[in-house]
């Protein structure tokens, strides 16, 4: 006789939430991760790090819970970011990487190309530039052409394509501009927000309005030791 489980423990709660979301909507569950200063700035002028080492290590653990990370060519070009798991015991070829690059502006000399030989990397574009498409394909990047990526309908088609490729849990790591777009389209479920205890003032800025940050609600602080930093999980309105 099979015993019916009445309660799901906290360890598996997120998994089951995404499972039921996938089953109901035939779409991947989309969450986001963002780092901000005490005065709610997301970019530091002379460094790409806003939060401390402990926060970044926990960020790698969060990444490991997702099938893929979505970022934009703008964010990757700015930080030369790998967007993988880089702490001992985790697979540094995971999660898979999805790059949104409408006009194929991704730089040709980036660290992620070295990992693309073994790591699944997808690039979604609306460009017809065959020369650049050939270049990226030679770098072992799977280029997928979209007719358009500007409306909610377009983005739902994009997410359904990722679902078809087997992606069930997706983490967004990008700038405020892109997050504002997805928030307005109501395509993000939860947000992990790492908050520094340091005000950046004139040494920091935002590249877009803080609409995304203002859209967050039901903040819950996660009990993890990040020294002076704090980690919150919130839902998007």
What residues fall within each predicted segment?
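Enzymes that bind and transform nitrogen-containing heteroaromatic metabolites
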Residues: 3, 7-237
């Amino acid at each position: 006789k099979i015993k019916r489980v009445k309660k799901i423990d906290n360890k598996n709660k997120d998994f089951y939430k995404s499972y039921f979301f996938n089953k109901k909507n035939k779409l991947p569950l989309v969450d986001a991760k963002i780092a901000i200063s005490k005065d709610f700035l997301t970019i530091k002028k002379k460094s790409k790090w806003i939060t401390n080492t402990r926060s970044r290590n926990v960020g790698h653990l969060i990444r490991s819970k997702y099938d893929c990370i979505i970022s934009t060519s703008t964010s990757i070009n700015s930080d030369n970011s790998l967007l993988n798991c880089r702490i001992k015991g985790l697979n540094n070829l995971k999660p898979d990487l999805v790059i949104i690059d409408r006009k194929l502006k991704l730089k040709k000399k980036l660290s992620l190309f070295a990992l693309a030989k073994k790591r699944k990397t997808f690039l979604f574009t609306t460009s017809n530039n065959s020369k650049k498409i050939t270049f990226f394909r030679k770098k072992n990047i799977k280029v997928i052409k979209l007719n358009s990526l500007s409306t909610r309908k377009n983005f739902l088609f994009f997410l359904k394509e990722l679902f078809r490729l087997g992606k069930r849990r997706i983490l967004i790591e990008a700038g405020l501009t892109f997050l504002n777009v997805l928030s307005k389209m109501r395509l993000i479920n939860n947000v992990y927000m790492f908050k520094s205890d340091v005000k950046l003032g004139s040494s920091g800025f935002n590249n877009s309005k803080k609409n995304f940050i203002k859209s967050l609600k039901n903040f819950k602080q996660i009990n993890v030791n990040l020294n002076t930093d704090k980690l919150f999980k919130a839902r998007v309105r």
